[in-house]
C-alpha cells in the first residue's frame, strides 16, 4: 500500500461514502499525515502497522502536551482510517480497535433560563425593520435549536410553515426537518410579509430568509454581534453566543421530559452521547422532583 494512493482513496471515501464537510475531511487527513510522518521517521511501512506501533505513536504525540480531547479525536480519526483500509484494501485487522480513548470530562454548556431569554427578546427595538428581523432570528434560534450556520443559510423554499416544519442543511450537507413552534412561525410570517419586502434584495440572495440592510445573506459574525449587543443591553454577565440558544433549546426540552432520541434528531447529532450532555439538570429542579414525588420527602 502506497501512502499517496491510500490517502486519495480515503479522501474520496470521506467525501462520497461519509458525506463529510471539507473541514472534517481536512481534520481526518491531517491525522493520517501525522501517522505517515511518524512511520517515515521509524521506517515502518503502512502494512506493518500494528497495535503496539499505534500505542508508541500516541505516546510520541502525547509528549507535545496535546489535550485529552485532541488525543481522543486523533484516535477516532485513525480508527476511521483503518476501518476504511479493512473495507477497501482488505486489511485483516484494525490496530486501533482495542485502544481506549482518553477519558474526557465533557464541559456542560452554558444555557439561558427562560427569564433570560425573555429579557433578551424584550430588549429588541421593534420600531425598526432590523429590530423585527432580530426578534425573528432569536425566536427561530431558540424555537428550533439551529446552529448559526444553519440559520444564516435558511431558505424560504425550505419553510413549510403551514405544516409547522422547516428544512435545514446541517453538517456534511445533511438535510433534516425540524418542527417549528407557533411563536417562531408568527414572527417569521411578520418578517417575510412586512419587513423583507422593504429590503433591496441582491441577485443570488432571493431565497435566503435573513438578509442584512444591503439585501445580502447575514454572516455568522453579524448574528453573534446582534446577540452580544442585546446581552450588554440587559447586563447579562454570563458568556453568550448564538450557540447558547441551541444549548438552551435542547436543555429546556430535556428538562421538560422530552425523549432524548427526538432531541437528537432535531439537533442533527450523529451520536446520542453528544445529546446526553443536556441531561444535566439544576439542583433546584432535582430537589423539587424529590419533594413532589418521593414518599419520604
Locations of the language-model features?
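Conserved catalytic core of the tyrosine transesterase superfamily
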Residues: 1-297
Amino acid at each position: 500500500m502506497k501512502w499517496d494512493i491510500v490517502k486519495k482513496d480515503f479522501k474520496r471515501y470521506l467525501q462520497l461514502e461519509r458525506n463529510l464537510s471539507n473541514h472534517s475531511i481536512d481534520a481526518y487527513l491531517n491525522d493520517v499525515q501525522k501517522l505517515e510522518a511518524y512511520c517515515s521517521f521509524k521506517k515502518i511501512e503502512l502494512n506493518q502497522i500494528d497495535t503496539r506501533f499505534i500505542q508508541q505513536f500516541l505516546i510520541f504525540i502525547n509528549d507535545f502536551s496535546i489535550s485529552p480531547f485532541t488525543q481522543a479525536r486523533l484516535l477516532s480519526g485513525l480508527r476511521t482510517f483503518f476501518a476504511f483500509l479493512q473495507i477497501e484494501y482488505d486489511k485483516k485487522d484494525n490496530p486501533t480497535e482495542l485502544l481506549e480513548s482518553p477519558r474526557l470530562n465533557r464541559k456542560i454548556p452554558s444555557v439561558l433560563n427562560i427569564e433570560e431569554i425573555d429579557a433578551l427578546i424584550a430588549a429588541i427595538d421593534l420600531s425598526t425593520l432590523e429590530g423585527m428581523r432580530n426578534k425573528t432570528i432569536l425566536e427561530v434560534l431558540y424555537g428550533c435549536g439551529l446552529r448559526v450556520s444553519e440559520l444564516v443559510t435558511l431558505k424560504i423554499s425550505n419553510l413549510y410553515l403551514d405544516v409547522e416544519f422547516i428544512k435545514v442543511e446541517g453538517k456534511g450537507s445533511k438535510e433534516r426537518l425540524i418542527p417549528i413552534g407557533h411563536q417562531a412561525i408568527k414572527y417569521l410570517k411578520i418578517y417575510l410579509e412586512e419587513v423583507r419586502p422593504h429590503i433591496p434584495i441582491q441577485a443570488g440572495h432571493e431565497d435566503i430568509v435573513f438578509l442584512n440592510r444591503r439585501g445580502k445573506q447575514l454572516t455568522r459574525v453579524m448574528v453573534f454581534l446582534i446577540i452580544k449587543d442585546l446581552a450588554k443591553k440587559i447586563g447579562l454577565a454570563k458568556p453568550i453566543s448564538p450557540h447558547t440558544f441551541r444549548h438552551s433549546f435542547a436543555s429546556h426540552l430535556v428538562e421538560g421530559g422530552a425523549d432524548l432520541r427526538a432531541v437528537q434528531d432535531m439537533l442533527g447529532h450523529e451520536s446520542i452521547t453528544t445529546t446526553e450532555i443536556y441531561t444535566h439538570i439544576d439542583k433546584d429542579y432535582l430537589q423539587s422532583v424529590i419533594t413532589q414525588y418521593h414518599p419520604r420527602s
